[in-house]
């Protein structure tokens, strides 16, 4: 198969390489600890939740994107981070070749390990283009994953229900 000769394709390989390097796989450029930054002292112990974080990831099986929303919760044990840092954590760990199931667990592990949290939970709701483009039924299907650790195991009330 030969590529069509078109002026629209001039520079396309470079644009695609830049897109993959600077956006789709940019998460490899830092660690979870770097994304979270230096934690702040906290004495309140109040449950922290951040919901509806938009994200995209890349399916390692098909090299096609998936996208949706991440919901995070953690119970601090004296260390917190700003909410923007939680968004950076999601970007860091999702902008890689990673299965959604693994991403869900990695986000929980990062909160537990980097913040030494008492507990952490994550729910992800996403649409996968590998399903959409292959024409599999049912149309509009979404993958929902959940993980929890520590004091938040079994606490379904800390995160919103995933889309139906």
What are these regions (language model features)?
Residues 1-164:
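A domain-level signal for the structural core that forms small-molecule/cofactor-binding pockets
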């Amino acid at each position: 198969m030969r590529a069509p000769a078109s002026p629209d394709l001039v520079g396309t390989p470079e644009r695609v390489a830049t897109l993959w390097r600077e956006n789709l796989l940019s998460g490899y450029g830092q660690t979870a600890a770097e994304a979270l930054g230096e934690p702040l002292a906290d004495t309140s112990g109040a449950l922290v939740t951040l919901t509806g974080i938009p994200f995209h990831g890349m399916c390692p099986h098909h090299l096609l994107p998936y996208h949706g929303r991440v919901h995070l919760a953690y119970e601090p044990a004296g260390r917190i981070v700003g909410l923007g840092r939680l968004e950076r954590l999601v970007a860091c760990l999702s902008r890689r070749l990673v299965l959604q199931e693994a991403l869900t667990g990695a986000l929980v592990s990062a909160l537990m390990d980097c913040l030494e949290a008492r507990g952490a939970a994550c729910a992800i709701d996403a649409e996968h283009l590998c399903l959409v483009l292959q024409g599999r039924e049912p149309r509009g299907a979404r993958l929902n994953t959940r993980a929890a650790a520590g004091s938040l195991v079994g606490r379904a009330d800390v995160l919103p229900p995933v889309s139906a």
